[in-house]
């Protein structure tokens, strides 16, 4: 079977790595990923030029295309590939609105009475935002309606001082058509612990993966700018230390109800559904959906797959997805980034990656925003690579990952607290306080 992975980051490297032993592997990427280029035939080009991607797939007799990033999904890459006879792991443009149009997602919850929603309003002018916030006596979250690479959301009490600043940021979002819409969503701020559940979907059935928790803040202690994610962990048993089986099951039910609603409102959803939840005193609440794997969370779950990913892909396109099995391990992912990220890029600087020692430690490296030139790896400004380790406990996996992070030399930084016992316990205690 010939499988094409579309995308160039660490998420796509993890997807390719999970497929490499069972398929003839191809990749279409905007820049050469040093890890993917070793294991796949590839073409370099803009992943958003969907006709060119489809031509590459047809020319190489691709059986299944696996779409990594959100931007091509929003442009209709799946529709274009399927028009050319290529089956896809990824939703159609219409179904991908679950991520690309947050107002569509919230309205879906409203229209189909799906549990786990929250107070929200969509606005297209500043005066209405101002009037609403004058009467709203709780902190809020301000979100552009469309895609902003995970960096457009601002929270009162974190990035914004008060609801007055929320008004000003809302005006900026509308005036600049941030995310491609002249609209803004205002949501109530939830108090709790965030967690992620990702699931394989075949249009009808949903096979959930182990839960994970991301760490979006740039610096240790959960401070600094919100990034695409500085690392994440998952636990043995598929839950998290603060997440019960009942809460996990409730979140999965919300995702199943969403899957049914998308099929009625748009088209059957095939691919990966990523649910970002907040565990609150009232149970799990849906923060947002992504129409693809999370980055970094893909790196937690894909190395734990027991069922071959190639078999899962075939089941998704055939519509007969059943239970997907994972090895019962914990995992920790730590992102290596340019020192001072996200304000400083160190673009063009060389880093050294001792892949052999990382492998000998039992960890994996997944490359992201780096370039390869004359066998040297260069930073290109954003998150550089993910280091992932698994173990019988989060503590064991974290220690391996931390040792492996020392195998990267250069002007780089990582959050050494991701997955540590102290930080995990802080999450557990926070949840206990909320529930009591």
Curated annotation (Swiss-Prot):
It catalyses: 5-phospho-beta-D-ribosylamine + glycine + ATP = N(1)-(5-phospho-beta-D-ribosyl)glycinamide + ADP + phosphate + H(+). Keywords: ATP-binding, Ligase, Magnesium, Manganese, Metal-binding, Nucleotide-binding, Purine biosynthesis. Pathway: Purine metabolism; IMP biosynthesis via de novo pathway; N(1)-(5-phospho-D-ribosyl)glycinamide from 5-phospho-alpha-D-ribose 1-diphosphate: step 2/2. Mg(2+) 2 binds at residues 288, 290. The keyword Methyltransferase does not apply. Mg(2+) 1 binds at residues 276, 288. Residues 106-318 form the ATP-grasp domain. GO terms for biological process: 'de novo' IMP biosynthetic process; purine nucleobase biosynthetic process. PROSITE patterns: ATP_GRASP, GARS. Its EC number is 6.3.4.13. Belongs to the GARS family. This is Phosphoribosylamine--glycine ligase. It comes from Methanobrevibacter smithii (strain ATCC 35061 / DSM 861 / OCM 144 / PS).
């Amino acid at each position: 079977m010939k499988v094409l992975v579309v995308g160039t980051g660490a998420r796509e490297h993890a997807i390719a790595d999970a497929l490499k032993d069972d398929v003839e592997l191809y990749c279409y990427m905007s820049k050469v990923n040093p890890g993917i280029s070793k294991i796949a035939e590839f073409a370099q080009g803009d992943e958003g030029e969907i006709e060119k991607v489809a031509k590459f797939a047809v020319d190489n007799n691709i059986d299944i295309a696996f779409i990594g990033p959100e931007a091509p999904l929003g442009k209709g890459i799946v529709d274009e590939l399927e028009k050319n006879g290529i089956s896809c792991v990824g939703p159609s443009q219409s179904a991908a609105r679950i991520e690309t149009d947050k107002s569509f997602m919230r309205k879906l919850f409203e229209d189909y009475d799906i549990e786990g929603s929250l107070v929200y309003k969509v606005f297209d002018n500043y005066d209405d935002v101002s009037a609403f916030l004058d009467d709203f006596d709780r902190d809020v979250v301000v979100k552009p309606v469309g895609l902003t690479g995970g960096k457009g959301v601002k929270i009162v009490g974190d990035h914004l001082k008060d609801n007055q600043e929320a008004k000003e940021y809302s005006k900026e979002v509308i005036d600049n058509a941030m995310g491609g819409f002249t609209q803004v969503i205002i949501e109530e701020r939830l108090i709790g612990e965030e967690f992620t559940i990702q699931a394989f979907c075949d249009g009808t059935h949903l096979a959930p993966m182990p839960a994970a928790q991301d760490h979006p803040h740039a610096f240790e202690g959960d401070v600094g700018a919100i990034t695409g994610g500085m690392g994440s962990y998952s636990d043995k048993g598929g839950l998290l230390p603060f997440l019960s089986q009942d809460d996990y099951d409730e979140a999965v039910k919300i995702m199943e109800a969403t899957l049914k609603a998308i099929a009625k409102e748009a088209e059957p959803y095939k691919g990966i559904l990523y649910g970002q939840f907040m565990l609150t005193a009232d149970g799990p609440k849906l923060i947002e959906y992504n129409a693809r794997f999370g980055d970094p969370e893909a790196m937690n779950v894909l190395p734990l797959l027991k069922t071959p990913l190639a078999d899962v892909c075939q089941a998704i396109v055939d519509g007969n997805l059943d239970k997907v099995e994972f090895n019962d391990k914990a995992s920790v992912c730590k992102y290596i980034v340019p020192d001072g990220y996200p304000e400083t890029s160190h673009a063009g600087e060389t880093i050294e990656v001792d892949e052999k020692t990382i492998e000998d430690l039992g960890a994996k490296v997944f490359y992201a925003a780096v370039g390869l030139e004359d066998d040297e790896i260069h930073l290109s400004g954003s998150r550089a690579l993910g280091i992932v380790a698994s173990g019988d406990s989060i503590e064991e996996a974290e220690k391996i990952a931390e040792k492996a992070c020392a195998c990267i030399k250069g002007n780089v930084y990582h959050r050494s607290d991701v997955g540590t016992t102290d930080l995990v316990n802080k999450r557990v205690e926070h949840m206990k306080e909320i529930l009591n």
